[in-house]
């Protein structure tokens, strides 16, 4: 209930500010379909579905004690949707996500590093971590290495974004790949249609894909 109430405050603040805007706009990498503005379109990844796929991948590899590092669900819409995806995957596999497996972090190396250390200090059994961004995944991996542990031998990691960083880190990071070029192209096309053709707002979800590389280990129970 607390989270839902804070979401309403966040959305109400955005609505109050955007209600003063009277020109066509496109919200990029975030959803605007529930905001109800005729002049506000959106193009984004389905963050909830993508996070659910990432978590399902870990469950399919035998992991059950999966931690989450990410932004504050009460302050960020993408973070809230990715948190929901995590919870949905847990429920699908007959489990309930426990809050002590969640560590909040900003989308930075340093913040995720500290968040991973916080999880390790809680001394809870963790075999895998889903990080809401590739930058977070790298920060978490550095904390794991500094604690004398290994990825994926001791703890598996899945990231989100599909940046080049995930391909050039060692080990390469399993990640959700967002199609940024398509998101950008569609955003511009929709904006021009709204301006030149006076078209009403549309809300599109661009397909995503899970990129399977090196940072996840299948447990023996699989």
Where on the chain are the PLM-derived regions?
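Bacterial carbohydrate/catabolite-sensing allosteric modules
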Residues: 9, 15, 19-222
């Amino acid at each position: 209930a607390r989270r839902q109430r804070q979401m309403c405050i966040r959305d109400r603040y955005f609505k109050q500010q955007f209600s003063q805007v009277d020109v066509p706009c496109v919200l990029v990498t975030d959803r605007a379909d529930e905001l109800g503005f005729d002049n506000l379109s959106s193009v984004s990844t389905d963050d909830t579905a993508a996070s659910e796929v990432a978590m399902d991948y870990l469950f399919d590899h035998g992991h059950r004690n999966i931690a989450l590092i990410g932004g504050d669900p009460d302050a960020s819409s993408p973070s809230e949707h990715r948190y929901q995806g995590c919870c949905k995957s847990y429920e699908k596999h007959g489990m309930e996500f426990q809050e002590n497996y969640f560590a909040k972090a900003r989308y930075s190396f340093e913040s995720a590093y500290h968040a991973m250390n916080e999880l390790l200090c809680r001394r809870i059994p963790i075999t895998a971590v889903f990080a809401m961004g590739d930058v977070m995944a790298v920060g978490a991996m550095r904390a794991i290495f500094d604690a004398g542990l290994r990825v994926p031998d001791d703890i598996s990691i899945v990231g989100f974004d599909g940046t080049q960083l995930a391909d050039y880190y060692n080990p390469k990071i399993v990640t959700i790949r967002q199609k940024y070029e398509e998101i950008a192209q569609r955003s511009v096309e929709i904006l021009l249609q709204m301006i030149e053709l006076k078209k009403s707002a549309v809300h599109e979800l661009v397909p995503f894909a899970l990129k399977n590389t090196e940072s996840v280990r299948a447990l023996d129970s699989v």
